């Protein structure tokens, strides 16, 4: 619930229309046209405060006049109260449309299948990016437009003999447009000023007027309301895949399957940006260098002539310009000379990105090999190995930054390494390659079915996407592996009753991930368990089916358990974890093309986090997305 307007959010307002047209041109040729249209227009999605850090006191002070629920400074929040103070209701609009044309042509021993599809998705997300009622951000609109066209052709062969197979081709063409505009609110300047001197807010409010005067800028230039940044990105993705697979019956009970696929992907990316927020464009290293040099030389300007006249002072200022001051350390000369301006670096979260137009081209051949043995008419044992490939992924968000060069940037006079400017990051994630080994058994009898599989998965250059509170960062773990097993069972207790049970055990780890993103910079996650992957998952369901005259009905209950896991890699498990214990139930019936269902979800009213992240522009504060509470509903469907 949004407490400023007393409005419930996370509502559901969705519509969906789908239709099919079937044409049987002959006994051998069938053509099917499927079209759909859907619309979402909701107040979504609700965010809860997980920890109200030191910046919370500033937001809740009269200077900013904002509120954070529940409002206790430097304390845990109450995320499962599902309440928040916002200065804007979040709105989520999604429009989907598309069609597909399926052709199935029986040519005797051969079969030709063709699937042509076209889809469009338009999105618009607008929300309060600081998730408080303080006017830190007035405008944060994300719009997307994705057009996708695909074509698949498959020619399969089955003459009833020992050999079966297929060959095919798949083409994928996707055009993505993504725009994001962020504008600061009326309170951000005061908020930023107080953060520069929290113990003396009055002095802090003079930080930026003094800095503007020193730079010869009009007062009010920095963090002016309704200034910010806009990005306009485009990505054209063209890909094709050529594949084939062959099944060979070695004897009546043993079948060997082998297949291969060649994938080629090309992506062209165009990134444009405009930035009207002036402070994020200030080079604080250059600023600090000028201030330090002036202080050491009695106010002289940082010019080549003065550097030559005062070489010792110039060298000291050059080294100090890239050294951040540490709280509590003695002032110079008792302590090291440092650049106090770098204390403002975290406030440059709308730092400009140089526009670029780049491309990537990737190709890979993957394969699958599988051996299956029919131990009996009811039992099948199999084992196999397969490989996979995922092409380069580009960061289309406003935090897309170039990779750091082999030779690091230098301080103004070149005497020291400059880790501050230019700002480097990750513009894309390298392609990832996977290998999966699996052995298993499948059994099916009159009233019992059992599937069991052991697997070992290895992903090289695992692609990770982490939200740091001010933007998304793409990266690669050198290697990520997972071992585990999966069990699925089905028991027909009678003609009316059915019991389903499944469980999965996963033991994943980052074999190599030395530069992962953490809450306070990079961290080494090598040897650690990836966030969000549960060790144990258990699902069970009981269904009762019945018929009375022309009415078919059912009653079903299902339960899901997922063991405790860290929610995201860059927040500790003590702050953001997830453990699931949910019970769902439904009762429904169908008659004359009408389906009617009454359902309840999360009847245990279980609480857990879907995701979490560092709060935007609020160092030390964290937010998260809680799950849906206990929910009831009715579904009515008509089949024409």
Over which residues does each language-model region extend?
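C-terminal beta-signal and adjacent terminal beta-strands/loops
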Residues: 183-189, 494-499, 560-568, 589-640
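Solvent-exposed loop segments that connect transmembrane elements
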Residues: 1-8, 44-85, 128-139, 181-230, ...
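Transmembrane beta-barrel wall of Gram-negative outer-membrane proteins
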Residues: 1-55, 97-99, 147-151, 155-172, ...
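Membrane-embedded beta-barrel scaffold of Gram-negative outer-membrane proteins
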Residues: 102-107, 111-117, 122-127, 374-483, ...
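Gram-negative outer-membrane beta-barrel transporters
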Residues: 156, 164-166, 170, 252, ...
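Transmembrane beta-strands of outer-membrane beta-barrel pores
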Residues: 37-41, 107, 118-122, 171-175, ...
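Repeated loop/turn-to-beta-strand initiation elements of outer-membrane beta-barrel proteins
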Residues: 28-31, 109-112, 162-165, 253-256, ...
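Residue-level signature of outer-membrane beta-barrel architecture
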Residues: 21-24, 35, 104-107, 147, ...
């Amino acid at each position: 619930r949004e407490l400023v307007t007393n409005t419930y959010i996370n509502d559901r307002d969705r519509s969906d229309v789908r239709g099919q047209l079937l044409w049987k041109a002959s006994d051998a040729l069938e053509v099917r046209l499927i079209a759909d249209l859907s619309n979402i227009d909701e107040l979504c999605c609700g965010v809860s405060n997980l920890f109200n850090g030191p910046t919370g006191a500033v937001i809740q002070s009269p200077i900013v006049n904002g509120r954070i629920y529940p409002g206790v400074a430097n304390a845990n929040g109450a995320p499962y109260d599902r309440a928040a103070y916002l200065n804007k209701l979040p709105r989520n609009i999604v429009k989907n449309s598309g069609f597909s044309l399926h052709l199935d042509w029986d040519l005797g021993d051969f079969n030709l299948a063709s699937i042509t599809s076209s889809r469009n998705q338009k999105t618009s997300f607008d929300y309060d990016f600081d998730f408080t009622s303080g006017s830190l951000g007035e405008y944060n609109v994300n719009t997307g437009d994705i057009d996708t066209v695909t074509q698949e052709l498959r020619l399969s062969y089955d003459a009833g003999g020992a050999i079966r197979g297929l060959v095919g081709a798949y083409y994928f063409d996707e055009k993505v447009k993504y725009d994001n505009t962020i504008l600061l609110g009326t309170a951000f300047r005061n908020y930023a000023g107080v953060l520069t001197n929290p113990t003396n807010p009055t002095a802090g409010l003079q930080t930026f007027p003094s800095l503007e005067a020193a730079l010869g800028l009009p007062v009010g230039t920095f963090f002016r309301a309704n200034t910010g940044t806009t990005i306009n990105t485009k990505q054209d993705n063209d890909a094709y895949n050529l594949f084939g697979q062959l099944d060979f019956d070695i004897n009546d009970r043993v079948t060997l399957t082998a297949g291969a696929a060649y994938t080629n992907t090309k992506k062209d990316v165009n990134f444009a940006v405009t930035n009207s927020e002036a402070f994020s464009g200030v080079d604080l290293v250059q600023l600090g260098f000028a201030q330090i040099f002036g202080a050491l030389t009695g106010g002289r300007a940082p010019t080549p002539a003065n550097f030559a006249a005062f070489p010792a002072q110039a060298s000291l200022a050059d080294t100090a310009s890239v050294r951040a001051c540490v709280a509590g350390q003695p002032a110079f000369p008792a302590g090291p000379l440092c650049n106090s301006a770098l204390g403002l670096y975290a406030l440059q979260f709308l730092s400009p990105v140089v526009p670029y137009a780049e491309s990537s081209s990737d190709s890979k051949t993957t394969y699958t090999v599988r051996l299956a043995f029919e131990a009996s008419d009811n039992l099948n044992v199999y084992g196999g190995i397969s490989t996979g490939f995922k092409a380069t992924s580009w960061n289309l968000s406003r935090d897309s930054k170039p990779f750091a060069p082999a030779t690091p940037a230098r301080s103004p006079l070149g005497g020291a390494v400059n880790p501050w400017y230019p700002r480097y990051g990750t513009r894309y994630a390298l392609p990832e390659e996977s290998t999966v080994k699996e052995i298993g058994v499948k059994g099916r009898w009159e009233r019992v079915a059992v599937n069991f599989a052991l697997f070992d998965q290895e992903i090289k250059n695992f692609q990770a996407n982490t939200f740091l509170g001010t933007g998304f960062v793409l990266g690669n773990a050198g290697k990520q592996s997972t071992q585990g097993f999966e069990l699925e069972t089905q028991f027909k207790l009678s003609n009316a009753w059915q019991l389903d049970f499944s469980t999965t055990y996963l033991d994943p780890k980052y074999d190599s991930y030395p530069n992962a993103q953490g809450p306070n910079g990079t961290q080494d996650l090598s040897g650690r368990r990836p966030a969000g992957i549960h060790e144990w998952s258990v699902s069970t369901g009981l269904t009762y089916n019945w018929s009375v005259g022309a009415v078919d009905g059912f009653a079903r209950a299902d339960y899901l358990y997922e063991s405790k896991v860290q929610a995201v890699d860059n927040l500790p498990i003590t702050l953001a974890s997830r453990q699931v214990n949910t019970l769902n139930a439904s009762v429904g019936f169908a008659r004359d093309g009408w389906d009617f269902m009454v359902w309840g979800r999360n009847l245990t009213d279980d609480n857990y986090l879907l995701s979490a992240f560092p709060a935007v522009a609020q160092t030390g504060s964290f937010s998260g997305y809680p799950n849906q509470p206990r929910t009831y509903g009715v579904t009515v469907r008509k089949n024409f």
